[in-house]
């Protein structure tokens, strides 16, 4: 972690330390009671793969050749600034069969002790709380047990199965309806989290959840690590899954860093913020 990154944006170009790079942005102070700060993070190959089918697996996995300790450090730093994490029911189904990438952050490993200490110094809870988006409410109850010290919310639609709702609530979760039918509406979910007092919200789920948040125009920042590798493969996930966004969501680079050390080929660390819509944007309603 001691080898530096090269900052490309903003100018001027210069070497910067990796450890502490994202913590220094103090994301937990950027939101307020009306507008929480919502951010997300992905690592992708150059050909857009964030997950691939794996042999002897029921679910896709982050490509092992692009995962690396330096990106993982920054992932933990982003989690370290969150009041609450947004994830999905899919994560907990993966977890119970041993296919989840890892436990939900912040990691308890010694390498991240400084992040946990930083949270304490900033007056944040020991760990961020958890918000689960789920239309089906198919969430294995035993998968929630490792997080019993955190507050757990489950967001679903108005037509959710009442028996599943009762079962989750009986096991300590707070179930909130945030949309008509079975699906969750991103804007309503963020509004409900704001009323619960959350100011910094970190979305760590997959392409469907990210699409839901983008569609609702609630994403304030995207952290995107681009591993300089080409992977191919016919079964894969990319950043977004869902209907065509109209208008397209323009994202401007507010930060860009080059890391030549990991993985093979190096990686680019991008920070993107949404471009404000103008009256002439195609597809604007």
Where are these regions (language model features)?
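Enzymes that bind and transform nitrogen-containing heteroaromatic metabolites
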Residues: 1-285
